Regions:
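Bacterial N-terminal signal peptides that target proteins for export
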Residues: 1-9
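Interaction-mediating elements
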Residues: 23-418
Length: 418
């Protein structure tokens, strides 16, 4: 129970009701509050009978109900020969957060809001950070679900949907994604879309999160196939159907692919020590290719590797993309910031048996201080091959940005015999 504020207590002391047994019959009960407060709703929450004798205890209980909602920062009252006046100071807007309903799929959002506003006095799409209003909304949701034949548990938590929001969701029974129908799908992408449908099926349904996941996932598949202007509509959902202990919701979205884009040009502003020719080979993007964000990401990775193979582990690859929506072409411009070259610091061979460590030390004679490039890695691999270990050994790289050095760590997936 939220305690009545000090302001309320002070006003009570000014009132003429000095004992619980005394009664007072007001000619009227009025609300003194800013215009933003719905006075009729406040009177509903107070629930004081009109034209009836009231005790001090009844009035204090009514005010406690108002305070407990969390909607008011201060609550008080005064009495005179004409009226009982309840004074309300609303909570600051920072103490109220919008409500998000995650998976109440039996209703459209606007219809659910209307039902809750009718059932819970004081609720208008926002919930206070403290108080009983959230619990009242949860109870109303449980009652509404009972009318649909669903015995449910409803939870509320902050920041589930977005920052500064309260998410209410059905936690039992589970509400999950059923079938996903994609209207206007391209036949060439059906295998990937089928994989996506199987991945989403059975996941928890959330009207906002599911919509975002469907749209982003479908759009990514199309964009990686060159359809950069693709638009996937927010999915509509069917009425829930019971599926064993869960309720499944079938989704339908329409895909508008647009035209496929192709690469018009790739300009590489190479920086030493990697040449433009080597970067072009690593990027493997040519005019006429389908313009794919996935291919661009792969090119970025491969060009960074080209610099890392020269000892430049901090190299940055900066793509600039110019999209021509008329010709449906893409021009790429790529700039490079190599950073500082890294040098070999040490090698950790502790994953090997002691005799193998000794044999490796004899085979690998490179001294620290050389550039940590592909030649260093080749020398390590050559030394490992000479040992004929019979199990794979991976090379782990541990760069130290403060000294621009690299420690090499040998890693094994199988434990060698000692």
């Amino acid at each position: 129970m939220r305690p009545i504020s000090r302001a309320l207590s002070a006003l009570i002391l000014l009132a003429p009701l000095t004992t619980l047994a005394q009664t007072y019959t007001p000619k009227a009960i009025r609300i003194n509050a800013p215009s933003t407060v719905d006075t009729a709703e406040a009177l509903r929450i107070a629930a004081l009978p009109a034209n009836s004798p009231l005790t001090k205890q009844q009035i204090e209980t009514a005010l406690q109900r108002l305070a407990d909602t969390g909607l008011f920062a201060d609550v008080g009252y005064t009495v005179n020969s004409d009226a009982l006046v309840i004074k309300l100071t609303p909570s600051a807007s920072s103490q109220l957060q919008p409500a998000h309903f995650a998976n109440f799929v039996w209703w459209q959002p606007a219809d659910l809001e209307s039902l809750l506003e009718a059932a819970v006095p004081g609720y208008h799409g926002q919930l206070p950070l403290a108080g009983t209003l959230t619990d009242q909304v949860k109870a109303a949701l449980v009652s509404l679900l009972h009318t649909k034949g669903v015995d449910a548990t409803v939870d509320a938590h902050e920041n589930g949907f977005a920052a500064d929001s309260v998410t209410l969701s059905i936690v039992s029974p589970s509400i999950v994604i059923g079938d996903l129908q994609l209207q206007n799908s391209l036949p060439a992408l059906l295998p990937q879309l089928k994989t996506l449908q199987h991945r989403l099926q059975g996941q928890d349904f959330d009207v906002a999160e599911t919509s975002r996941a469907v749209q982003e996932s479908v759009n990514d598949l199309y964009r990686n196939a060159g359809y950069l202007d693709v638009n996937t509509s927010a999915p509509t959902h069917s009425a829930p159907r019971k599926d064993l202990l869960t309720y499944a919701v079938d989704l339908t979205s329409t895909v508008t692919p647009g035209d496929v884009y192709h690469v018009s040009s790739l300009q590489l502003h190479a920086q030493p020590p990697v040449s433009e020719a080597d970067l072009a080979k690593a990027a493997n993007i040519k005019p006429g290719d389908i313009a794919s964000p996935a291919a661009q990401r792969l090119a970025t990775s491969e060009m960074k590797l080209a610099y890392a193979n020269q000892g430049y582990f901090d190299a940055k690859v900066l793509f600039t993309v110019h999209q021509n929506s008329t010709s449906h072409t893409i021009d790429y411009t790529c700039d490079f910031v190599p950073g500082d070259v890294y040098h070999f610091a040490s090698i950790d061979t502790s994953a090997l048996a002691l005799d193998q460590q000794a044999a490796f030390a004899r085979a690998f004679t490179v001294a620290p201080g050389i550039v940590a490039d592909a030649h260093l890695l080749a020398a390590i691999q050559q030394a490992l091959q000479s040992l004929k270990l019979g199990f794979p050994v991976r090379l782990g790289m541990v760069p130290d940005p403060s000294t621009h050095t690299v420690k090499i760590v040998l890693k094994t997936s199988a434990s060698p015999a000692h």
